[in-house]
Amino acid sequence: MIIDTTTVQAINSFSRLKSLNEVYGIIWMLVPILTLVLGITIGILVIVWLEREISAGIQQRIGPEYAGPFGVLQALADGTKLLFKENLFPSRGDTRLFSIGPSIAVISTLLSYSVIPFGYHFVLADLNIGVFLWIAISSIAPIGLLMSGYGSNNKYSFLGGLRAAAQSISYEIPLTLCVLSISLLSNSSSTVDIVEAQSKYGFGGWNLWRQPIGFIIFFISSLAECERLPFDLPEAEEELVAGYQTEYSGIKFGLFYVASYLNLLVSSLFVAVLYLGGWNISIPYISVPEFFDFEINKVGRVFGTTMGILITLVKTYLFLFIPITTRWTLPRLRMDQLLNLGWKFLLPISLGNLLLTTSSQLFSL
């Protein structure tokens, strides 16, 4: 059988074009993910700098000032230092669990950002179960902490891992019930739909005013999830040296450091999305898509998306002042006080709040 030369050339060019299209498709798929990771990295650097400056102001001392203008590059300098430090392994520990633990803590928190809408249609994955996917993913992080504590073969590390697991279980249930109340009010579990449900009445339509009890419980539970003071028992210095982080050094210790700030940022972003109206301007009957005419005007779409991202970030970083100042205001709880607060107070109150929300929705039908 004789094949024409032109046919062979056509087949080769078609296969080459197909492979190029596949490469372009992969690149186009990676662009938003890499953009999100870059944005998160910058966001964490800003949070670390803000916390150090606010903490210095509260304690009436001078914060970081030499690494870059106003000390903005101090976190980057600390990260670079940890990157070049030696990774030490405990001699009798489980090296596999010891190495996997920090990665699970970081990856599970990073995946939570995929369902956060930073602007109108500016979300990596707009899912019908977005908020509950976040809760499911965030519940994986304590497994990594427990693995780190167990793999270290150290009594302080293991006790810190057990505390982290117990604390996470105690406060995830009230947090989930608060999110369920928001879903009932918005008639959706999509993060985009929840933001749009708050846009009609502007500032007065925020879920903060419709769910004040849920907001307080969500805030307390998110502080406990992030292991911020007064809920930092898994790594209490006076009791457990550094908890599950005791045996870590170098980049692995840096991963735990990054994971804690990733968790703090994602919690604040979800507060902005669920309770503070997300990307919307706080003016009644004016939403970002309608104001900038998204459907017709392409320039307005770009400008509106940028404005939505800025509004979301402003709300997030303004809210971040509360957990940062709380760190230097309240004393650490005992373990029994922490568990009593979660099981005996927050859980019944969040159940009552869910019952009230369900009743109001039924009567409004």
UniProtKB/Swiss-Prot annotation:
Keyword check for DNA damage, yes or no: no
The UniProt entry, under InterPro entries, shows:
NADH_UbQ_OxRdtase_su1/FPO, NADH_UbQ_OxRdtase_su1_CS
Could you tell me the EC number(s) of this protein? Answer: 7.1.1.-
Q: Which residues form a coiled coil?
A: none
Q: Does the keyword Transmembrane apply?
A: yes
Intracellular or extracellular location(s): Plastid, Chloroplast thylakoid membrane
Q: How does it sit in the membrane?
A: Multi-pass membrane protein
Q: Please give the start and end residues of each transmembrane region.
A: 30-50, 104-124, 129-149, 253-273, 302-322, 338-358
Q: Name one GO biological process term.
A: aerobic respiration
**Can you list the GO cellular component terms from the UniProt entry?**
chloroplast thylakoid membrane
Q: Per the annotation, which location comes first and is thus the protein's main one?
A: plastid
Q: Which Pfam families match?
A: NADHdh
Catalyses which reaction(s): a plastoquinone + NADH + (n+1) H(+)(in) = a plastoquinol + NAD(+) + n H(+)(out); a plastoquinone + NADPH + (n+1) H(+)(in) = a plastoquinol + NADP(+) + n H(+)(out)
Q: Name the source's superkingdom.
A: Eukaryota
Subunit-level organization: NDH is composed of at least 16 different subunits, 5 of which are encoded in the nucleus.
Q: What is the stated purpose of this protein?
A: NDH shuttles electrons from NAD(P)H:plastoquinone, via FMN and iron-sulfur (Fe-S) centers, to quinones in the photosynthetic chain and possibly in a chloroplast respiratory chain. The immediate electron acceptor for the enzyme in this species is believed to be plastoquinone. Couples the redox reaction to proton translocation, and thus conserves the redox energy in a proton gradient.
Q: Which family does it belong to?
A: Belongs to the complex I subunit 1 family.
Designated name of the protein: NAD(P)H-quinone oxidoreductase subunit 1, chloroplastic
Q: Which organism is it from?
A: Populus alba (White poplar)
Q: Which gene encodes it?
A: ndhA
